UniProtKB/Swiss-Prot annotation:
Originating organism: Citrifermentans bemidjiense (strain ATCC BAA-1014 / DSM 16622 / JCM 12645 / Bem)
PANTHER family named in the record: 39S RIBOSOMAL PROTEIN L10, MITOCHONDRIAL
Superkingdom of source: Bacteria
Record-linked CDD domains: Ribosomal_L10
InterPro entries: Ribosomal_uL10, Ribosomal_uL10-like_sf, Ribosomal_uL10_bac, Ribosomal_uL10_bac_type, Ribosomal_uL10_CS_bac
Family as reported in the entry's similarity comment: Belongs to the universal ribosomal protein uL10 family.
Name of the featured protein: Large ribosomal subunit protein uL10
Alphabetized SUPFAM superfamilies for the sequence: Ribosomal protein L10-like (SSF160369)
The protein's role, per its UniProt record: Forms part of the ribosomal stalk, playing a central role in the interaction of the ribosome with GTP-bound translation factors.
Membrane-spanning parts: none
GO MF term set: large ribosomal subunit rRNA binding; structural constituent of ribosome
GO CC terms in record: large ribosomal subunit
Length: 173
C-alpha cells in the first residue's frame, strides 16, 4: 500500500471513527475468512461495520476523536467494529458470534460515547435488552399510572350503576 492509499484510508477511518457511536476492538487470531465474512454480514444488519486495519493507521486516524482512549489497545492483530446506530445490538452480535463459533476472537476494549470500556463492560452492554424493549418498558411504566387512574374513574360510575341495578332488582322481587 503506497503512501497516498494510506492517507486516504486514514482520512476514511478518521471520518468513520467520528461518526461511530461506539467502537469495539478485537484480536482476531483464530478466525478464518468464512467466519470474518459471516461476522461482517451480521454486524451490517445491526448498522455496524467490521474492518481489519493496521494498528499504526488506526492510531493516526483516531487522533482528534473521542476514540483516542483506544490507542494502548492497538497491538497485535486488531479488528475494529464501528457501530453507527445501536451499540447494544452490535455488542450482542459480537458476543453471540463469539459464543457460537468457539471464541474465534478476543475482545480487547471499546469506546462508548467517548468513554473507554473494558471487556466486562462490553459483555454487560451485550446483556442489556434491545433498544426497542427498553423503550417499550419505559413507555409501559409511564402509561401505567394514567391507565390505572382511568380504571379508577371508570369504576366509580360502574359501581353506582351496579348499585342502582341491585335496587331495581330488589324492588321488582
Amino acid at each position: 500500500m503506497n503512501k497516498e492509499n494510506k492517507q486516504e484510508l486514514v482520512a476514511e477511518m478518521h471520518d468513520k471513527l467520528q461518526r461511530a457511536q461506539a467502537v469495539f476492538l478485537a484480536d482476531f487470531r483464530g478466525m478464518n475468512v468464512g467466519q470474518a465474512t459471516e461476522l461482517r454480514n451480521e454486524l451490517r444488519k445491526a448498522n455496524a461495520e467490521y474492518k481489519v486495519v493496521k494498528n499504526t493507521l488506526l492510531e493516526i486516524a483516531s487522533k482528534g476523536t473521542d476514540k483516542e482512549g483506544l490507542n494502548p489497545y492497538y497491538a497485535g492483530p486488531t479488528a475494529i467494529a464501528l457501530c453507527y446506530d445501536d451499540p447494544v445490538a452490535a455488542a450482542k452480535v459480537l458476543s453471540r458470534f463469539n459464543k457460537e463459533n468457539t471464541n474465534p476472537f478476543t475482545l480487547k476494549a471499546g469506546v462508548l460515547t467517548g468513554k473507554t470500556i473494558n471487556v466486562a463492560d462490553i459483555q454487560a452492554l451485550a446483556d442489556l435488552p434491545s433498544r426497542e424493549v427498553l423503550i417499550a418498558k419505559m413507555l409501559g411504566s409511564m402509561q401505567a399510572p394514567a391507565s390505572n387512574f382511568v380504571r379508577v374513574l371508570a369504576a366509580v360510575p360502574g359501581g353506582f350503576v351496579r348499585a342502582l341495578d341491585a335496587i331495581r332488582a330488589q324492588k321488582e322481587a
